[in-house]
Amino acid sequence: MATLQQQKIRIRLQAFDRRLLDTSCEKIVDTANRTNATAIGPIPLPTKRKIYCVLRSPHVDKDSREHFETRTHRRIIDIYQPSSKTIDALMKLDLPSGVDIEVKL
């Protein structure tokens, strides 16, 4: 038996600000649902933490250090059975500049 492979769009989002990321995910899911496509997600992925250690003093004191950290929050949204209306609506969607988007067909 031959099974038909479903069409799927996978959208991967990254941002430093979690609230920006969540609002972007809501916009994408609402847009997909309005065009009669099935949206699954947002699926949260593990948060990446990058810690930087910096010396406080410009001279000798090696004991005095300061730590800074960046957190990268990530989400995945799968859209099944997309139509041409779905793709056009997603292309016209205006998302904040702090959100990194990667789309795979």
UniProtKB/Swiss-Prot annotation:
GO terms for biological process: translation. Keywords: Ribonucleoprotein, Ribosomal protein. GO terms for molecular function: structural constituent of ribosome; tRNA binding. Gene3D superfamilies: Ribosomal protein S10 domain. The keyword Zinc does not apply. SMART domains: Ribosomal_S10. PANTHER family: 30S RIBOSOMAL PROTEIN S10 FAMILY MEMBER. Part of the 30S ribosomal subunit. Belongs to the universal ribosomal protein uS10 family. This is Small ribosomal subunit protein uS10. It comes from Nostoc sp. (strain PCC 7120 / SAG 25.82 / UTEX 2576).
